[in-house]
């Protein structure tokens, strides 16, 4: 009987959807889902293109903001100091970056100079005199303020007479004019409220509004073309207003610091009697309000944070954050933990407030987290152990101190004097921090300047 032939060919696996095997998990996925999707038709509308570009720019801007914020958060712990030697100059009170490598500074000894942060070269700038120079009798006050206008074409600072306002042209630092008929005491602070108008705050309790007109600028150019000797105009104040003195000691109503809110066209002012004053600035100065500060000793510095719509006010041991539109009891204050030495300078960069103290410290307050940045734990062998929760603190270097008669008679038994941070400023990239000052006691003569990067 013949044996039945058997085929040795393997059966092909059943296709999904063909019979009961279609439900097997091994074959349960649908190939049709993985077919190439048809792309939408390209829209050639100009409006569509512009809207797409706008969204893309918004995303790039948002990413850039996040990146800048992250850098501002991480930078302070990475900064390293490089000191500059300023010779025998006495106490740097004011500073501003002119460009990526030059910083202009003003001192207690009434010297205006530019330091090149790459070469350390110091260049002194001639200071401008009143039309009657013989009337200058005050000594030991110096240049307390330096400010650049929004377009960075003009610089305002103090003159040879500390009561007068001096204007220079940038980037050449050629003299433009002097406002010499306004204040009866030293100028402590300056704020530009437009490209051609600046406000000065004085120790006599007044605020002066000055305008650098096109006529003044044109005459300045013409005079420079004719004469090689610097020639400049003399201008008169556009307005002169006294801060309120009704409820305080009139002798202590000194305008110490100014800060401008460009969005609302409002100018904040701090006086040494512990008050904050707000002014409207539209071709003149109109008072809006005055409020008592929660910490009213040694209110010597003020800054405005545009993104946060708050003023930061420094006092003897605290930084207070003030929104003029909120009730005074809503003012938040933070303690620097360096009692007695005073907050000497304050600034905003992104969400970080940098605080310079009389003890030579730089502290960094995170306004979003509402706390000071803390030290990162160091695992390096031989390094000083850092306590958990300890504030991140940078300390200024030794600087220079004159061992004169005052030092020998009163301070020679003290080994080291910290250099108060009277001024600090970030460059446009936010990666370099210029810091300057000098010894805190008024009788001591010395200086400090350094680049932290």
UniProtKB/Swiss-Prot annotation:
The keyword Repeat applies. WD repeats lie at residues 138-178, 182-220, 250-289, 338-375. Coiled coil: none annotated. One of its GO terms (molecular function) is ubiquitin-like ligase-substrate adaptor activity. One of its GO terms (biological process) is protein ubiquitination. Residues 1-27 are annotated as: Disordered. PANTHER family: DDB1- AND CUL4-ASSOCIATED FACTOR 12, DDB1- AND CUL4-ASSOCIATED FACTOR 12-RELATED. Component of the DCX(DCAF12) E3 ubiquitin ligase complex, at least composed of CUL4 (CUL4A or CUL4B), DDB1, DCAF12 and RBX1. This is DDB1- and CUL4-associated factor 12. It comes from Bos taurus.
């Amino acid at each position: 009987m013949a044996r039945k032939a058997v085929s040795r060919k393997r059966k092909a696996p059943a296709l999904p959807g063909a019979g009961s095997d279609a439900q097997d998990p091994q074959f349960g996925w649908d190939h049709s889902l993985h077919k190439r999707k048809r792309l939408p038709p390209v829209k050639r509308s100009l409006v569509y293109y512009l809207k797409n570009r706008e969204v893309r720019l918004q995303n790039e801007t948002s990413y850039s903001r996040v990146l800048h914020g992250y850098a501002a958060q991480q930078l302070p712990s990475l900064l390293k100091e490089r000191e500059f030697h300023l010779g025998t100059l006495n106490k740097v009170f004011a500073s501003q970056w002119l460009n990526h490598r030059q910083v202009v500074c003003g001192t207690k000894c009434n010297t205006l100079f530019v330091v090149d942060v790459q070469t350390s070269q110091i260049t002194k700038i001639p200071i401008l005199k009143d039309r009657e120079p013989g009337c200058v009798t005050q000594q030991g006050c110096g240049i307390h303020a330096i400010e650049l206008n929004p377009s960075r074409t003009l610089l305002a600072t103090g003159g040879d007479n500390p009561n007068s306002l001096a204007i220079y042209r940038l980037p050449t630092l050629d003299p433009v004019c002097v406002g010499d008929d306004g204040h009866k005491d030293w100028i402590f602070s300056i704020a530009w409220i437009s490209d051609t108008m600046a406000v000065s705050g004085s120790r006599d309790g007044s605020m002066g509004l000055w305008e650098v007109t096109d006529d003044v600028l044109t005459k300045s150019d013409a005079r420079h073309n004719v004469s090689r000797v610097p020639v400049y105009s003399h201008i008169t104040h556009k307005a002169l207003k006294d801060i309120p003195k009704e409820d305080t000691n009139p002798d202590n109503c000194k305008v110490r610091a100014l800060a401008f809110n460009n969005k609302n066209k409002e100018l904040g002012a701090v006086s040494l009697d512990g008050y904050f004053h707000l002014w409207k600035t539209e071709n003149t100065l109109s008072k809006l309000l005055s409020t008592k500060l929660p910490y009213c000793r040694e209110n010597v510095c003020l800054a405005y944070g545009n993104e946060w719509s708050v003023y930061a006010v420094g006092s003897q041991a605290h930084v207070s954050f003030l929104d003029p539109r909120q009730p005074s009891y809503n003012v938040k204050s933070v303690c620097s933990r360096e009692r007695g030495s005073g907050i000497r300078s304050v600034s905003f960069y992104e969400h970080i407030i940098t605080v310079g103290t009389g003890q030579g410290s730089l502290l960094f307050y995170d306004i979003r987290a509402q706390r000071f940045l803390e030290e990162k734990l160091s695992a390096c062998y031989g390094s000083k152990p850092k306590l958990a929760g300890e504030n991140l603190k940078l300390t200024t270097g030794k600087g220079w101190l004159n061992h004169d008669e005052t030092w020998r008679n009163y301070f020679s038994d003290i080994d080291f004097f910290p250099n108060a941070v009277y001024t600090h400023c970030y460059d446009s990239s936010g990666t370099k921090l210029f810091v300057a000052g000098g010894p805190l006691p008024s009788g001591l003569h010395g200086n400090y300047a350094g680049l932290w990067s």
